[in-house]
A protein has these predicted regions:
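Short loop->beta transition adjacent to catalytic acidic/histidine clusters or analogous donor-positioning motifs
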Residues: 4-7, 27-37, 58-59
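Short, well-formed alpha-helical segments that are part of the catalytic scaffolds
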Residues: 15-28
Length: 130
């Protein structure tokens, strides 16, 4: 059965020493239609500059602060509603999970099937995804 084209979604707090290797590895091993990165505005500008010469699938960078604006949410409003008590997790961690799992709400033309990838997971070999 031929695989349908798919996108990869990554939440990125900050570009690190391995970011290029992760993105180029994903492109090499999985040939995604596109890679969507959700990050803070300042990081988005830096990443656009850094990635110009990288060998990646098309990169689309999205502002995490207003990612859910079309459905009436902002990062601040979501985090303000969380009452975590003595949880080990921060409101920002929960928001990160919403960004990854709710990517279809904030990314126009996202593939029907998409892969959520952690930004620090280096793809050293191809694993079956579907």
């Amino acid at each position: 059965m031929p695989q349908e084209p798919f996108d990869i979604v990554i939440h990125l707090f900050r570009a690190r020493w391995n970011t290029r290797a992760v993105l180029e590895g994903l492109t090499l091993h999985y040939q995604p239609r596109a890679i969507h990165i959700i990050t803070l505005p300042a990081e988005a500008e830096s990443l656009k500059t850094l990635s110009q010469d990288w060998a990646t699938a098309p990169l689309y960078i999205h502002n995490e602060e207003v990612f859910f604006q079309t459905v009436g949410f902002t990062k601040a409003s979501v985090c303000a509603e969380l009452n975590l008590g003595k949880s080990l997790y921060t409101p920002g961690w929960f928001y990160q999970q919403l960004l990854k799992l709710g990517a279809f709400e904030g990314i126009r033309d996202l593939s029907e099937w998409y892969v959520v990838w952690d930004s620090d997971l280096l793809p050293a070999e191809t694993w079956p995804l579907f």
